[in-house]
UniProtKB/Swiss-Prot annotation:
Residues 31-98, 259-333 form the ACT domain. PROSITE patterns: ACT. One of its GO terms (biological process) is L-valine biosynthetic process. The lineage of its organism: Eukaryota, Viridiplantae, Streptophyta, Embryophyta, Tracheophyta. This is Acetolactate synthase small subunit 1, chloroplastic. The keyword Zinc does not apply. One of its GO terms (cellular component) is chloroplast. GO terms for molecular function: acetolactate synthase activity; acetolactate synthase regulator activity. Transmembrane segments: none annotated.
Amino acid sequence: MEHIQTRTTLSQLSTLPSDKRLGAIRFKCLLVMKVEMINRIAGVFARRGYNIESLAVGLNKDKALFTIVVSGTERVLQQVMEQLQKLVNVIKVEDLSKEPQVERELMLIKISADPKYRAEVMWLVDVFRAKIVDISDQSLTIEVTGDPGKMVAVQRNLSKFGIREIARTGKIALRREKMGESAPFWRFSAASYPDLEGAMSAGTISRTIKRTPNGESMSMAEGDVYPVETDDNSGVSQVLDAHWGVLNDEDTSGLRSHTLSMLVNDTPGVLNIVTGVFARRGYNIQSLAVGHAEVEGLSRITTVVPGTDESVSKLVQQLYKLVDIHEVRDITHLPFAERELMLIKIAVNAAARRNVLDIASIFRAKAVDVSDHTITLELTGDLHKMVRLQRLLEPYGICEVARTDVWHWYVNQVWIRSTCEDIHTLCSLKSSNLRKIPALCGMCANVDD
């Protein structure tokens, strides 16, 4: 689903008529995911000269939920919505700009941190309710979630230490519920993740029969944003699956998911050009996240595509030929951390609210909006963490889910290796006993936060 929000200044409101006010509008768009769909969506904006400020794509099998922020006048952006709705595979487009909403994005920021300033940095991290996710002798990597205003404040306060690198996901948002009103109820299912479907119990599946807004019953297999396919796809590679491409020792095909990090100019049409390179070569984009970089005028694109090492190497060479590309890195075989941001709205009354909050505290999720019939939670982590929380919340009824794509972050390899060695020495653990999330070194895997 694609979603865009309007932001206008007082000066613009006083000098421009209503149809010519400039602002950033957020669309919510649900579509059937095909190889070329991201390129077609970006092309609608590029042909009209609009620069995409933020893009978040939550993929799941053949469906995708888009959240895009662009700037323009209200009249023209209304025309853009109509053009998006005409695309064959677009199911629904919705503008939530004028609705009260919970808006969040995820930012990873790497700063220079001399040991004598560490105490001050840690104090700022605590003030902004951020987390340290990576550390070395001369740098710290900080994870922070919040609205755009909070992101600006974090950057301003940390800039004096020296910002080395910034990675930001696209913005996601959910509508705030009003007291006394009934929430839209879609009952999203965590079982729609194909590699985790087997763990669903019969009782849980029986509870996922839902009704559409028209009152018609809809089985879970018909799906919404995160559908469950009833077809037997065993033995078939699902290239949109989040964990497709992880090679086993006996896998000789060479296919795997490759993570590419690109630094590009922040100008209209760049995303369309970049995704066009993938589309022309038949690459399906498993994951895509776009956000502002640490340097003004530049954006960072992180994408995941399936392929062999050789074919992706040729793809990187083609990307380097683009004028607006400053840097392309394949970080698949490098140590990196991954994070995803999710907003999830649960239908719950006052009697069950305590139970939901207890579950949220276990997963370190935060309540960001509460009404008399819903709770909206914010959660960061990896895919399995998201799925486990959704499974526990399904019996209460899940109204809406908004997700960023998985954001991959290159970490300090020297520190990770030394830390892993310490863990093995002190705890006498074997690498096979450690929880496996994307590997950070040859000895073991990253530990879930």
